């Protein structure tokens, strides 16, 4: 039985060690996006330069804007902006006042080409230099929302698992890490030796992470309270306890259980208050359940028809029943809804391409589109506002990386790469909101 349970974790390892082409830089597709130039009234002090540099990175790491900071000299007033030599559609002018040692007031003005007035302006007061990245992400969110009408995601977080000493018989280290969306400000929130951590998933209020782990001779599902570090075991069933995810209201989790010594797993919904279970599936190996944004359905992976594919089930059905998502999909794993419920992003193994890529299924028109082109791309997780997808890629040397791609497939960039084959990065989960 231990071999069966261990197989759940080995599956993640194998997927992560398939070959893939690592994408490590921003590449822009054919759709021309509005260009934003970030300029400053201070190009001498380190703090303004750092803030503007992070802002430019943020405004390039999305599906709707592109940015640069080509002006390397001070601009005090909007009248000094050299519009004729710029190709920019917008300029973000940042003005810094050094109030005291390590403390600034920052004024941000958004200007539009051929417009003599300020499009938008905002002031941030008493900002300590230690908050440099937080300030930059906050300004980027403001600019992004004003120029696109959509909320920015630059203050969101990513949770993921890092495995070290991968090939050691004993002493394998598992760390659950939370970082900023761009990989900075990493914090290890849980560390275990020789006890795997898998498939972390956030609660909608951002207070908890639910995950599965093999500990004390058995597999279980646990919650981690992020603020306190408190860990609570919430399942103790025989056999496989895996792939948990929270319902939108945080009152339930969906998970996969074998409930004994069978190698088959079924999807259940657990009420967290009463621990009561409702069974959603009845046959095959069913795993990786995710709730729809409205909480009325669950999407999951099943091999019931001979190969893994995506199925959808209603959470309100009296008896277990589910249907295949689309006959257009050959093999698929790890589905995730976009926040608007109009798309499902998943790991795709097409009959026309080798390896696995991240793909987007449009629930409105039924189209399937690969948005990555690697050979071992897996574990997609969607940003809280739906523009971007984080995922795991593995290159030809077997090194894993945490990467990001826009939902339209145009922009790719790297967040973190394992620096050797003895480290594995896996199971990313995007926070549900800005912090």
UniProtKB/Swiss-Prot annotation:
InterPro entries: 6-blade_b-propeller_TolB-like, PD40, Tol-Pal_TolB. It comes from Francisella tularensis subsp. holarctica (strain LVS). Gene3D superfamilies: TolB, C-terminal domain (2.120.10.30), TolB, N-terminal domain (3.40.50.10070). GO terms for cellular component: periplasmic space. GO terms for biological process: cell division; protein import. It is found in: Periplasm. It holds the Pfam family PD40. Transmembrane segments: none annotated. Keywords: Cell cycle, Cell division, Periplasm, Signal. The keyword NAD does not apply. Residues 1-20 form the signal peptide. Its main location: periplasm. SUPFAM superfamilies: TolB, N-terminal domain, Tricorn protease N-terminal domain. Part of the Tol-Pal system, which plays a role in outer membrane invagination during cell division and is important for maintaining outer membrane integrity. This is Tol-Pal system protein TolB. Belongs to the TolB family. The Tol-Pal system is composed of five core proteins: the inner membrane proteins TolA, TolQ and TolR, the periplasmic protein TolB and the outer membrane protein Pal. They form a network linking the inner and outer membranes and the peptidoglycan layer.
């Amino acid at each position: 039985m231990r071999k069966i349970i261990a197989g759940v974790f080995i599956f993640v390892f194998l997927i992560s060690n398939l070959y893939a082409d690592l994408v490590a830089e921003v590449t822009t597709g054919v759709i021309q996006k509005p260009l934003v130039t970030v300029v400053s009234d201070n190009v001498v002090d380190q703090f303004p330069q750092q803030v503007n540099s992070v802002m430019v990175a943020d405004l390039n790491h999305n599906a709707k804007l592109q940015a640069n900071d080509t002006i390397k000299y001070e601009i005090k007033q909007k009248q000094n902006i050299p519009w004729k030599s710029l190709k920019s559609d917008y300029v973000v002018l940042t003005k810094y006042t050094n109030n005291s040692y390590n403390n600034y007031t920052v004024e941000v003005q958004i200007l539009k080409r051929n417009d003599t007035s300020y499009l938008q302006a905002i002031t941030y007061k008493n900002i300590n230099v230690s908050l440099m990245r937080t300030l930059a992400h906050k300004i980027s969110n403001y600019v992004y929302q004003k120029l696109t009408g959509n909320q920015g995601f630059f203050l969101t977080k990513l949770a993921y698992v890092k495995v070290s000493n991968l090939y050691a018989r004993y002493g394998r280290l598992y760390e659950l890490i939370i970082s900023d969306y761009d990989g900075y400000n990493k914090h290890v929130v849980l560390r275990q030796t020789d006890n795997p951590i898998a498939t972390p998933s956030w609660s909608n209020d951002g207070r908890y992470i639910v995950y599965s782990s093999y500990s004390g001779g058995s597999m279980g599902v646990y919650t981690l309270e992020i603020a306190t570090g408190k860990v609570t075991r919430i399942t103790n069933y025989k056999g496989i306890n895996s792939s948990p995810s929270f319902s939108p209201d945080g009152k339930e989790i969906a998970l996969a259980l074998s409930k004994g010594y069978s190698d088959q797993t079924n999807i259940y919904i657990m009420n967290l208050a009463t621990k009561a279970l409702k069974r959603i599936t009845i046959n095959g190996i069913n795993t990786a359940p995710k709730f729809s944004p409205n909480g009325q359905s669950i999407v999951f992976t099943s091999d019931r028809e001979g190969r893994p594919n995506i199925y959808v089930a209603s959470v309100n059905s009296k008896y277990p029943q589910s249907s295949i998502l689309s006959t257009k999909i050959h093999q698929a794993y790890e589905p995730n809804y976009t926040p608007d419920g109009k798309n499902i992003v998943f790991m795709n193994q097409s009959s026309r391409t080798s390896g696995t890529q991240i793909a987007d299924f449009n629930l409105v028109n039924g189209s399937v589109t690969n948005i990555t082109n690697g050979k071992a791309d897996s574990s997609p997780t969607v940003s809280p506002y739906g523009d971007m997808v984080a995922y795991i890629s593995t290159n030809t040397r077997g090194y894993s990386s945490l990467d990001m791609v826009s939902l339209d497939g145009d922009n790719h960039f790297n967040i973190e790469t394992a620096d050797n084959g003895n480290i594995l990065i896996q199971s990313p989960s995007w926070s549900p909101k800005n912090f």
